[in-house]
């Protein structure tokens, strides 16, 4: 279930933009962040885009699983890990800095699948 109300229109992430999916927050297991639109533009390659994302913690958890989920339509049930994309999840308790590749979607969000201990979850998504 997302943490945030649906907003119309959604925030969009263009190349070079930084979006805060979680900003020093305490999401529980199963909580999703606000969603962001990934606009299409002329000349966009068919092999998908790359999305850089970074995870950090104020206090490191003992165990964690965070996913970068995408969807074609902005419907909670459609958000999932995309087939064929790489670097879409992290279990590193010290934080992570990844580049998700092969992403073909219109919307993106972060989801805390599980977390034990720790505090101050921050997830940056870079367009």
Model feature map: region roles:
Residues 48-55, 101-121:
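Noncatalytic modules at the cell exterior or secretory-pathway interfaces
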Residues 61-80, 123-126:
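Short, surface-exposed beta-strand/strand-loop-strand elements in extracellular ectodomains
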Residues 5, 10, 25-26, 108, ...:
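Residue-level detector of intrinsically disordered/flexible regions characterized by low predicted structural confidence
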Residues 18-46, 57-67, 84-98, 115-120:
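Surface-exposed ligand/attachment interfaces on beta-rich extracellular proteins
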Residues 1-19, 122-127:
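Short, intrinsically disordered N-terminal pre-domain segments
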Residues 14-21, 51, 55, 110, ...:
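Short beta-strand element of the conserved SAM-dependent methyltransferase core
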């Amino acid at each position: 279930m997302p943490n945030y109300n649906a907003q119309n229109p959604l925030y969009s992430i263009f190349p070079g933009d930084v979006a805060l999916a979680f900003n020093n927050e305490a999401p529980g297991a199963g909580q999703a962040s606000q969603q962001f639109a990934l606009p299409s533009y002329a000349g966009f390659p068919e092999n998908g885009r790359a999305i850089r994302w970074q995870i950090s913690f104020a206090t490191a958890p003992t165990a964690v699983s965070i996913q970068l989920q995408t969807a074609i339509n902005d419907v909670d049930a459609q958000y999932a890990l995309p087939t064929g994309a790489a670097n879409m999840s992290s279990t590193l308790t010290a934080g992570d800095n990844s580049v998700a590749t092969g992403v073909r979607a219109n919307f993106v969000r972060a989801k805390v699948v599980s977390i034990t201990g720790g505090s101050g979850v921050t997830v940056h998504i870079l367009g």
